[in-house]
């Protein structure tokens, strides 16, 4: 009887061989049938112990595993036994180390490297998304299973960690043992500018960088549910071409050569899928959207798409893929609608991402997660080909697209790269705009207005601390030649909040609600909240739209006049009513949506301030409104400990370069990264 002996190295040997990069896509093999094991042999012997078997339905919360010891067993009987008694009709996956030696009848040896795929993927979800109809849940399970089957098992976190995660998961990728020392260095030491330089000088290959960020992204996803798609294979393929080009020509293809960029789910990338956060809207992308085409031509590498809210239109990124968690406190939201990006970047699973913003959807999640986010004046960057553009809301309020990242110079790199491609030539909506960014000179003292509150909602305690911190630094006499600090009172915050909510949904939300419910998908709490608010307003007719736009334009003139009378160049204030919100409670967007209403550029910047569990409102607090009172109740009902605080810097419309000039002044004073 011929035998097949399987020689399995120790766990340490497996780790070393894996870190040496010996696993490749070409060596991938899935054991799905007894034929793949026996290869025509009469019987097969294993010399193994502690082999882990897994199978069963793909779920987000539970992964079935069975640990057994096997000695001198026959392949077909054991396969049939396990298949029938444990896995039913599921495929069998043997989770083994990488290197196997098979001896056949003629005693020749075949050596194979196997990369096993996960059958299911467990994700931390302390607050589950609502369940839909059985038919919808079956479709959803199919999507989740397809995602899981792309993930090599060596990239899975221990089930014990998923079941009992720390409140702050931001450090797990560094300590979990999945990343090599080099991969940790690549993902933690460099910003996008630094990575581009390291690749151009051949310190790292584009393949090494793509591998590092792909691995860290899937680790981050298991902890925060930040992804909708993960396509490491496409990233490696693209990176190999870039490395070959650099080797042959001795130069890069562009300023983003080899830089991995993560992309919000509704931005089409050829060969992937896009959606608006609900099942009915999922479509296959045959071509790149305009922004993606520009970034690809500049050398960017795409490796994942990120989670967003149902319909995109609220500040919590919970969709059929699950709920995105804040890396610094998983009981808090990562924000929306670009919350997946924010969480991924904060986890250092991305160095640079692209978001959209029509009410705060870049700035709020960036602030929730303590990173940079820039909303340009609306017509500066291209959105041709994005799903949901133009949306019904854009009858009245224009959307912006922009970068999210961890350094000032990365925002500048992004803007320089995209605008250098002259996107206005292919998209008439885009305005020709010469970009000077961080090189814009500031030839006079910067007049900066500080916002303590917007006259409608007082910010929660840690945001007040951050404002005080910034004011104290900016008011230091040693900076008197650089900045003049003033108090600033925003015009019409309550009025703009009332008007913009009406203008977002000129159809009363009927189309979006219908698209969700058509498949049996449940309405998520914040989706329900929005439509309860908007349904009474009903469908707008032409006269309603005309009047709303007239009121908007009148407001914009009044806002500009108020700004001019207060005589400031830029304003610095809260990015949100508080730190990251507790799940399902992101009700008030007033500190971001105001600047969408007037279409002013805004950037959120990180501070060293973190929320503390024991913080309280000041004695003698008097609410400015019912909303203000509710915000205090939200603070007292949750634990925000550890949540980062960003502040928001805003300039006049089309003063985007001046905004970046102001950032160069604030960089040293506030020690901005």
Residue ranges and their predicted role:
Residues 203, 220-280:
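N-terminal, positively charged, Ser/Thr/Ala/Gly-biased leader segments
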Residues 255-401, 451-453, 506, 571-588, ...:
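Short glycine/serine-rich loop/turn segments
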Residues 117-175, 393-394, 406-434, 438-441, ...:
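Acidic-enriched catalytic cores of C-N bond-cleaving enzymes acting on peptides and small amides
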Residues 6-7, 48, 92-244, 472, ...:
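An N-terminal boundary/leader segment
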Residues 193-200, 214, 452-459, 510-620, ...:
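Serine-dependent amide/ester hydrolase catalytic core
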Residues 219, 293, 297, 346-451, ...:
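Structural helix-boundary/capping segments
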Residues 16-18, 30, 35, 42, ...:
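Intrinsic-disorder-associated, low-complexity terminal segments enriched in Asp/Asn/His/Tyr and depleted
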